[in-house]
Design a protein with these regions (language model features):
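Long, distal/terminal scaffolding or interaction modules
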Residues: 1-146
């Protein structure tokens, strides 16, 4: 079912749950993080390999994966989002700062980068760096080819 923890969840290899994963602070795995439903952290989410959720992925700080990030719903981070490969969201992507990946970004709806509300982001912090935005509309942010 769900993994819920008041502070941090940290694993040398994988974190996997049939339903959801939720931590009051951060979630970190040396390999991958996978949940049948959603993944939520009050602070950051970091995986040496991929991050995958049947529904949404949400972090108060940043989201970082050595490989890809995939969510059936939306992906949201208070800071930036970074993936070694591609990023795929069933709905949209919203990041307080930049979104970066080496391959493609695929979403059904909209993409927002650099929408932090507590200060004005620099031009660098509004960049969406990828090979190509395959689908979806860039509502806010500057697309830069990886």
């Amino acid at each position: 079912r769900c993994i819920t923890f008041g502070r941090c969840i940290k694993a040398g290899r994988c974190i996997e749950a049939g339903w959801g994963i939720k931590a009051g602070r951060g979630i970190e795995a040396g390999w991958g993080i996978e949940a049948g439903w959603g993944i939520e952290a009050g602070e950051g989410i970091k995986a040496g390999l991929g991050i995958e959720a049947g529904e949404g992925i949400e972090a108060g700080w940043g989201i970082e994966a050595g490989l890809g990030i995939e969510a059936g719903g939306g992906i949201e981070a208070g800071w930036g989002i970074e993936a070694g490969w591609g990023i795929e969201a069933g709905w949209g992507i919203k990041a307080g700062f930049q979104i970066t990946c080496l391959l493609d970004i695929t979403v059904r709806l909209r993409i927002f980068a650099g929408v932090c509300t507590w200060r004005l982001p620099s031009e660098e912090e509004t960049k969406i760096t990828c090979r190509i935005v395959k689908s979806g509309t860039v509502a806010f942010g500057l697309v830069v080819k990886a």
